[in-house]
Amino acid sequence: MKIKKGFVLREVCGEQVIMGEGLGALDFGKLLCLNETAAWLWNRAVGAGEFTVDGLAEDLCGEYEVSPEQARTDVAAIVAEWQKVGVVE
């Protein structure tokens, strides 16, 4: 998977929000606020170019004290949300 071109993480009123660059790509019904961990994962995914749930889960285990099973469950849920709003392909 990869992050679709044109979507970026921005801070809006103290919140980390995924949004489309340019007004044509912006759909306020599909803005997604991220917590600190999800924003960290987003930045890892952007930096990687291509990513997998397992790869991000492994990265998460290296950064936070979390079991591999819990990391995979959490990453899968976050990536599912990204897919739901159409920011990954």
Where are these regions (language model features)?
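Acidic, low-complexity/disordered tracts enriched in E/D and polar residues
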Residues: M1-A39
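Long, charge-rich, low-complexity alpha-helical segments
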Residues: K30-E89
